[in-house]
Amino acid sequence: MTAIQQFFKTFFLTELLKGLALTGRYTFKRKFTVQFPEEKTPISPRFRGLHALRRYENGEERCIACKLCEAVCPALAITIESETRADNTRRTTRYDIDLTKCIFCGFCEESCPVDSIVETQILEYHGEKRGDLYFTKDMLLAVGDRYEKEIAAAKAADARYR
């Protein structure tokens, strides 16, 4: 580009006019706005929200205390303690997730060999104190029991891609 062409581009502010033209084009287009609490957009089956622990159909918890989720968690948000039962199977005595540390990466769900820990599609939860976002085993099992139908439906919808 010659110096004269560069001078005219700078003098006539062509880059500025191109930017204003682009802005003007989008100014009159129809907007897409969702009034959030009343309206909700569909959520992907792969959405990673609140954690839950699942049970088998007979009521026994699925977690076998392999601690893969604890090992793979990059944020170190999962704490597991386990004991051996009388029938020589290992089960968790403590399973805690600190949601203030969790980055919702989904590695815990992917590493679980028995689909015990899942991330639900629940995105509306809060805590007024820091301790409210510290979920214990009983709290996670309660979430899993309450939303088992939705969890199973999301797993079934996503099964073809796994």
Swiss-Prot record:
Residue numbers binding [4Fe-4S] cluster 2: 73, 102, 105, 108
Binding-site residues for [4Fe-4S] cluster 1, renumbered to this chain: 63, 66, 69, 112
Predominant subcellular localization, coarse grouping: membrane
PROSITE patterns for this protein: 4FE4S_FER_1 (PS00198), 4FE4S_FER_2 (PS51379)
E.C. code: 7.1.1.-
Cofactor or coenzyme needed: [4Fe-4S] cluster
Gene Ontology CC, one term: plasma membrane
Catalytic reaction annotation: a quinone + NADH + 5 H(+)(in) = a quinol + NAD(+) + 4 H(+)(out)
GO biological process: aerobic respiration
Annotated family: Belongs to the complex I 23 kDa subunit family.
Function as written in the Swiss-Prot or TrEMBL entry: NDH-1 shuttles electrons from NADH, via FMN and iron-sulfur (Fe-S) centers, to quinones in the respiratory chain. The immediate electron acceptor for the enzyme in this species is believed to be ubiquinone. Couples the redox reaction to proton translocation (for every two electrons transferred, four hydrogen ions are translocated across the cytoplasmic membrane), and thus conserves the redox energy in a proton gradient.
Protein name: NADH-quinone oxidoreductase subunit I
Source organism: Burkholderia mallei (strain ATCC 23344)
